[in-house]
Amino acid sequence: VAAEMPISWPDEALKAQAIAAHSYALYCRDHAAEPASGWLSVDPVRRQGYLTDAVLRSYWGTAYEENYARLSALVDSVLTDVLYYDSAPAGASYFAISNGMTEASENVWGTALPYLVAVDSSTDLNADNYLYTVQFTAEQMQQTLTGLGLLPDPAAPASWFGEAALTTSGYVASLPVCGQSVTGPALRKALGLRSACFTVQYQEGSFLLTTKGYGHGVGLSQWGAKALAEQGQSAEEILAHYFPGTELRR
């Protein structure tokens, strides 16, 4: 939980994150091809999924003991809480910031799950760095596109990108790139973009890519959970909003 949300965020948001992470871990266990060889990955070096005690101490400094005690108490209070769908733990995925709507799972991972559908998360528009622009030189973009097996014409960089087709939630489903169709998630990964909700502009020899939100967009918006908690919603209410049709079991 400490790796996923700032300790300064509301109790109910932190509890919602803890329940989602627990449920997602159980879902991964139940759907692993080879459970004995591992079914969930974390990357402490990149601060993903898990933080070492040393890193937590460096983050929290003199507030370490107080913060750890608070977070431990919050996690302990929901330790046995799990989101279920159809009598099995739900794949309660989570991410940082949406574009204002969450994304349906089939548009990102190819598999539709009835509780991973588009829901409103318009409070995310107030998130820090909701809009974020990165710049690529034409040479950098050419190298990336070539790495995707595309053939960009060096003499006509303005023609490399066509008009994007969007999902219902407004993320890029696909777009023409150098005469071929590339999915939004694939281009996001190749370019290291914060989100698959992006626009592309070419001007004066450079490409400007502006994203809305941060993360894959499926499931619990962490910023949205913070906003709903600040509005007085409980962890259970937050999870019911982002994972419709699920049941919280204790």
Where are these regions (language model features)?
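Conserved, single-site charged/polar hotspot
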Residues: 1-250
